[in-house]
Regions:
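Conserved, carboxylate-rich catalytic/transport cores that coordinate ions
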Residues: 61-405
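Coiled-coil termination/hinge junctions
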Residues: 8-63
Length: 405
């Protein structure tokens, strides 16, 4: 019996070694295939091969050294700075620090920026972190998400693309736990140190959601104005960006003045701020069109006030989904607590884990989908078009084998 067990272990070890060899051979074949496909794109004769492509700025010296070592003086390398005519076809590769880089997934899901655009990922990372955490707020859920992704990154040999997703959700797990601390929720149980009570402070959470939405919209409008200034379209910078920022701030001040009589002067300032900039949109449109034909587009632009109201209303989902997840978790705990003591600590534990597993999955799914929706529509809709083409360098296939420089 001992001999048979030892023999089985030897066979398994041998099979595992053969599997590793097969994986290496598969990567080798994939590399040969990729190399052959690249050769077909070359301009070549019997004695000459010409290759044109893009390379990252910091890799130019490595390329020169590699070609010199491999071919010596038999190769001619010409490096050209990007011309203005190439702006529409230059490929894009995002570059951010380790904390921001995982959120490139959100930007890439929508569209890469064009060469002349700024990478929105740093700003996206802040808002998405807040959105996801607020919609799935629970200390237990956040710790599980953080711990599970950390374990996977430490112990599993995953592809770089999957590792990036795991780092993305690990950071989001921190946001979920932090909002869980604010709401005082731990697997649906109410903790005594909650800063905001999800049962009694619903209006407070609603106001926070709208304020977060207001800041998001303001940021989008500011980036819109900044983008148009960079493109030297000053009329669009005012009409589509800065003017609406001032109008919405004015309306917010006006609302505060109406709600709180002591702030009547603030309301008066807000009313004038909104009115002056609404008139400013009309005047700038007429002046830029050099005729009264600019009046029509100006009035249509002012009609967009309804879309901004809709944007702010859309952010109430931050409250709705957060409260829904907390309420469902509490309901599951109540169901398990109604079991007799024996059942509570047997089948009740299994039921507790299963129900909270479902609620956690749905909370994360909702946070992922609705967080992306708020970014794509309410934020990107103000300033970002995308349309960039991804940079795809010639490199070895890494399906199973990882290469280190």
């Amino acid at each position: 019996m001992l001999f048979r067990s030892t023999s089985t272990k030897i066979q398994l070890a041998s099979s595992n070694e053969e599997l590793k060899q097969l994986k290496c051979q598969l990567d080798y074949v994939l590399n040969l295939t990729s190399r052959q496909e690249s050769k077909e794109a070359l301009a070549s004769t019997q004695n000459l091969v010409a290759l044109e492509g893009w390379i990252e700025q910091e890799q130019i010296e490595d390329l020169k050294m590699g070609l010199a070592q491999q071919f010596g003086g038999a190769v001619l390398l010409q490096i050209h700075e990007m011309a203005a005519a190439d702006r529409q076809r230059v490929p894009i590769k995002l570059k951010n620090n380790a904390l921001i880089e995982p959120f490139e997934l959100v930007t890439e899901m929508y569209s890469l920026p064009k060469y002349e655009d700024k990478d929105p990922t740093p700003v996206v990372s802040v808002f998405y972190f807040i959105f996801f955490g607020m919609m799935a707020a629970d200390i237990g859920y956040g710790l599980l998400l953080f711990g599970g992704t950390t374990w996977a990154l430490k112990t599993l040999h995953v592809k770089p693309s999957l590792a990036k997703n795991l780092r993305f959700f690990r950071i989001l797990g921190i946001g979920v736990a932090l909002w869980g601390v604010i709401y005082g929720s731990f697997f649906g149980f109410k903790l005594p140190f909650a800063l905001i009570n999800t049962s009694t402070d619903v209006i407070t959470i609603l106001i926070i959601s709208v304020v977060i939405g207001f800041v998001t919209v303001m940021t989008g409008l500011f980036l819109s104005g900044k983008k148009n200034i960079r493109m030297k379209d000053y009329a669009a910078a005012y009409n589509s960006g800065f003017a609406w920022m001032l109008i919405l701030i004015g309306l917010a001040l006006l609302a505060a003045g109406r709600l709180f009589p002591d702030l009547a002067m603030v309301g008066f300032i807000g009313e004038w701020l909104a009115t002056v900039n609404a008139v400013g949109i009309v005047l700038v449109s007429i002046i830029s069109a050099k005729s009264l034909k600019g009046l029509g587009p100006a009035l249509f632009n002012l009609y967009n006030i309804s879309s901004y109201v809709g944007d702010l209303v859309s952010f109430t989902r931050l409250m709705a989904l957060g409260l829904a997840g907390a309420s469902i978790g509490s309901a599951f705990n109540l169901i398990v607590s109604l079991f007799p003591p024996f059942a509570r600590f047997s089948i009740g534990i299994v039921l507790f884990l299963a129900l909270h597993g479902i609620n956690m999955f749905l909370s994360f799914l909702s946070g992922y989908v609705h967080g992306a929706r708020l970014i794509f529509v309410e934020f990107f809709g103000k300033f970002y078009d995308g349309g960039g083409k991804a940079f795809k360098p010639l490199k070895p296939a890494e399906k199973y084998v990882r290469y280190k420089k």
